[in-house]
Amino acid sequence: MLEGLGSPASPRAAASASVAGSSGPAACSPPSSSAPRSPESPAPRRGGVRASVPQKLAEMLSSQYGLIVFVAGLLLLLAWAVHAAGVSKSDLLCFLTALMLLQLLWMLWYVGRSSAHRRLFRLKDTHAGAGWLRGSITLFAVITVILGCLKIGYFIGFSECLSATEGVFPVTHSVHTLLQVYFLWGHAKDIIQSFKTLERFGVIHSVFTNLLLWANGVLNESKHQLNEHKERLITLGFGNITTVLDDHTPQCNCTPPTLCTAISHGIYYLYPFNIEYQILASTMLYVLWKNIGRKVDSHQHQKMQFKSDGVMVGAVLGLTVLAATIAVVVVYLIHIGRSKTKSESALIMFYLYAITLLMLMGAAGLAGIRIYRIDEKSLDESKNPARKLDSDLLVGTASGSWLISWGSILAILCAEGHPRYTWYNLPYSILAIVEKYIQNLFIFESIHREPEKLSEDIQTLRVVTVCNGNTMPLASSCPKSGGVARDVAPQGKDMPPAANGNVCMRESHDKEEEKQEESSWGGSPSPVRLPRFLQGNAKRKVLRNIAAFLFLCNISLWIPPAFGCRPEYDNGLEEIVFGFEPWIIVVNLAMPFSIFYRMHAAASLFEVYCKI
């Protein structure tokens, strides 16, 4: 018996091979382990291991190079922020300009080489660089270019006392932004298989260049917010806990004073969009770096489609929240710092609004998680760098908000005096922690669900179709050889004949497994039936309404901190407990991650909406 299985001349093995080669997914070939391995078969595996060693070294060396550049840039940013001796703003801008020019040279070389070999087949990661993602980065890039134009106008107005680097930097940044968006539109999905070592260094250099530009934008925006906070505290009579205003205004007169003042204020209103652009570009480039030399499977990602039908409830509620958020932010910015009474009323208004919104978001997230858990659909565990990065970013950036919230909770518990508005801060801080936890679970459940097409393919693979060539085949892929059917068919009574001589057999299951499978697929014996989750139109509409509502809510919660509505600065309790400078450092470090979390969560929820 063993010799018969291992013999290549066995008629049963030959028949199985012909069925496997012709029937495709409708037939199952015998396990490959039944055939003896050639003595030379382990050799390619050893060669593959040896070949992968240089690539692992290149990945490690390129990542270390990127970290060195990033750490050097952060130290330069820190030195300029604390006014270190011998470090000026011109030094910082020269360093960032040099990094951008080097990235521009690499992108031009890559685009030129890709254009010269455009007729060659290139592997693509269908999960990376989605259309809505590229559209978002294009919008942020346009605003970043407008920001660069304002900076050029600011330089022209103060050209008498500003160095030339402050004019060269915005020009270089604008050109860098335009070319980078073009590069990401055309090559974000690439899986690079040639010049891999060189490309690793080029891509990782681009990643950390964008991260340094992001850090530079965060630092400038934080300095501006801190100065406004100090001015409000001085107005309210808390000048004893403040330090000297960190003013970087040039020591000369602008040619049109009114225009220069408008430009300087407009610059800081555009910084949030520039910050989002830089971090979004760095994440897309990081996925490109992880995909270098990657071997992709044959499964293609199902293309997501945006459909607006059936989400009226979620969209209306979300747009209502968005309008209410804009109104709250406007009232908050008008009243805060005017007087002690107006500041307290503005804080109470914000806390009540945020508590209500966070409770609604938490309830919506719990409802979505409950629907997924009842559904009991299998998860997609395939390796996906883009999806893994999304999950890591959600957890990592949420930690910034959690740090601020835990600091507020400790300050409330440890403070000696408690103004009335602090008791609204306590439930707000607790809900901020819980809501992000629930929302992350909902997003993880959604993005790891198998798409509809994959589930059908899995069911199809469970059906083995064997056709008799004497009659019309059951499927176009069935072989037309009667001998094959006779050799493959088992000699027993377990396989009932089908009409027209076709024989369709399913995998053998015991009775318990059949009952479980029938109950999980709605009790229908049909092997090709959609999951219960996708059969229920009502459940799908509920999930899409939840995703749409959470998407608009996250956009709404991104607006207040991005445009200066930051109660962590203004309530004053944390500054009294922890000290002014320690608490300001904590807020300035954690706030950028908290702001980015909302935008990234909104992007993930948009993907969830399109996937449902």
From Swiss-Prot:
Membrane topology according to the record: Multi-pass membrane protein
Low complexity biased stretches: 1-46
Region (Disordered): 1-50, 499-525
UniProt superkingdom: Eukaryota
One GO term (biological process): cellular response to insulin stimulus
Modes of activity regulation: Activated by both acid and alkali, with proton influx in response to extracellular acid and proton efflux during alkali stimulation. Inhibited by Zn(2+); this inhibition is thought to be pH-sensitive. Currents evoked in response to mild acid (pH 6.0) stimulus may also be mildly potentiated by exposure to Zn(2+). Activated by NH(4)Cl.
Gene Ontology cellular component terms for the protein in this record: membrane; microvillus; plasma membrane
UniProt keyword Metal-binding, yes or no: no
GO MF: identical protein binding; proton channel activity
Cytoplasmic face of the membrane: 1-58, 113-130, 189-196, 291-311, 371-388, 445-544, 606-612
Spans traversing the lipid bilayer: 59-80, 89-112, 131-153, 164-188, 197-223, 265-290, 312-334, 345-370, 389-413, 424-444, 545-563, 582-605
Extracellular side: 81-88, 154-163, 224-264, 335-344, 414-423, 564-581
Keyword field contains Cell membrane: yes
Subcellular location: Cell membrane; Cell projection, Microvillus
Keywords: Biomineralization, Cell membrane, Cell projection, Hydrogen ion transport, Ion channel, Ion transport, Membrane, Transmembrane, Transmembrane helix, Transport
Outcome following mutation: H229 to R/K/D: Abolishes proton channel activity at pH 5 and 4.5
Catalytic activity: H(+)(in) = H(+)(out)
Ranges of biased composition (kind: Basic and acidic residues): 506-518
Functional description taken from the UniProt entry: Proton-selective ion channel. Biphasically modulated by acid and alkali, mediating proton influx and efflux in response to extracellular acid and base stimulation, respectively. Sour taste receptor, which carries inward currents in response to extracellular acidification. Sensor for ammonium chloride (NH(4)Cl) in taste receptor cells. NH(4)Cl acts by increasing the intracellular pH, thereby generating a driving force for proton entry through OTOP1 channel. Might also participate in alkaline sensation.
Subunit structure: Homodimer. Interacts with STAT1, independently of STAT1 phosphorylation status.
Homology family: Belongs to the otopetrin family.
Swiss-Prot/TrEMBL domain comment: Residues involved in the gating by extracellular Zn (2+) and pH are located in the extracellular loops between transmembrane domain 5-6 and transmembrane domain 11-12.
Stated name of the protein: Proton channel OTOP1
